[in-house]
């Protein structure tokens, strides 16, 4: 009887130790998992937070500089061979060559550009980006390289109907959502009262006017000049002469506080200006009249 009682007590003790051991193991595993999550969260937080001068090391370590773009002729577009080309495409590659990193390009939705930038999906917004006071609150800019303006595009058939801003009262207006074109419409005493049609890209603004969905299209002079007129898909469209909205400048947008990358990019731009490379690119893509370093 005593032997049975002792055996039972020993068995209970062994089971107790086993249960404690299991509980301890599970607890330790849970703690390890939680620690991993916190570490990962901290790591992600570090990756997505731009500290002063901190981004350049991140870019240098990965060896690539990702430019966020939309298709915007003559800045970034696909040629007849399906190759990405354009003024800013070549400009980006030239700057990256100076910096010793590989240029890469990521198409983005323009109205989500700040989200993409801060999430580090891209390292810069390099696509006809207009410098504004509002944008300066959310990103840092390189030196300006193009002086641009917003213009109004109409059908050639309506050239006698829309001759100045006052004559455009009541006409539906298309512009790329979140663009300088939309801002120009909102700032206009006349156009701000008209029906607004938002497009996902500037090239779609031309489609809206061509199809008759919108009577007016407000977009960058640079793109309008390159995309409409004889020999293009938009030979039936024209720029309204004398109506210029919101003079502006293009620059490269980078993460707020990223001073080291800005300094390096500006240094590379200065070299490209000094050796004539940037001016040659401007002339190649029909941008000599808006090239900032001559105008």
Residue spans for each PLM region:
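Short helices/loops that flank or line small-molecule/ion binding pockets
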Residues: 97-98, 106-107, 111-124, 138-140, ...
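Ligand-binding cleft/hinge of the Venus flytrap
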Residues: 77-81, 92-101, 180-200, 228-233
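Ligand-binding clefts/hinges and TM-proximal coupling segments of bilobed small-molecule sensing domains
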Residues: 46-54, 180-199, 235-240, 267-295
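A ligand-binding cleft/hinge motif common to bilobed small-molecule-binding domains
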Residues: 112, 129-137, 184-187, 210-211, ...
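Periplasmic-binding protein-like
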Residues: 147-154, 221-222, 229-267, 288-295
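Flexible hinge/capping segments at coil-to-helix
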Residues: 154-172
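Extracytoplasmic small-molecule ligand-binding "clamshell" domains
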Residues: 30-128
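Bacterial lipoprotein signal-peptidase II cleavage site
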Residues: 5, 18-35, 40
């Amino acid at each position: 009887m005593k032997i049975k009682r002792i055996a039972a007590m020993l068995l209970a003790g062994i089971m107790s130790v086993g249960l404690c051991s299991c509980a301890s193991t599970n607890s330790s595993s849970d703690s390890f998992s939680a620690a991993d999550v916190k570490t990962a969260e901290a790591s992600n937080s570090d990756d997505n937070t731009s500290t002063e001068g901190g981004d350049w090391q991140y870019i240098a370590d990965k060896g690539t500089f990702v430019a966020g773009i939309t298709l915007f002729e003559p800045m970034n577009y696909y040629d007849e061979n399906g190759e990405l080309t354009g003024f800013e495409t070549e400009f980006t590659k030239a700057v990256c060559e100076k910096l010793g990193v590989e240029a890469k390009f990521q198409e983005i939705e323009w109205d989500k550009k700040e989200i993409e930038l801060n999430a580090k999906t891209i390292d810069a917004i390099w696509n006809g980006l207009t410098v504004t006071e509002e944008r300066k609150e959310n990103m840092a800019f390189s030196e300006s390289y193009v002086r641009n303006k917003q213009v109004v595009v109409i059908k050639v058939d309506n050239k006698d109907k829309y001759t100045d801003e006052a004559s455009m009262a009541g006409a539906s207006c298309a512009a790329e959502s979140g663009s300088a074109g939309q801002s120009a419409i909102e700032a206009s005493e006349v156009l701000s009262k008209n029906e607004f049609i938002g497009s996902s890209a500037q090239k779609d603004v031309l489609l809206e006017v061509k199809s008759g969905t919108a009577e007016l299209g407000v977009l960058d002079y640079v793109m309008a000049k390159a995309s409409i007129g004889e020999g293009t898909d938009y030979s039936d469209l024209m720029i309204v002469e004398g109506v210029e909205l919101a003079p502006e400048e293009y620059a490269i947008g980078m993460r707020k506080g990223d001073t080291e990358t800005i300094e390096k990019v500006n240094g590379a731009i200065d070299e490209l200006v000094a050796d004539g490379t940037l001016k040659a690119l401007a002339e190649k893509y029909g941008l000599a009249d808006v090239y900032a370093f001559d105008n």
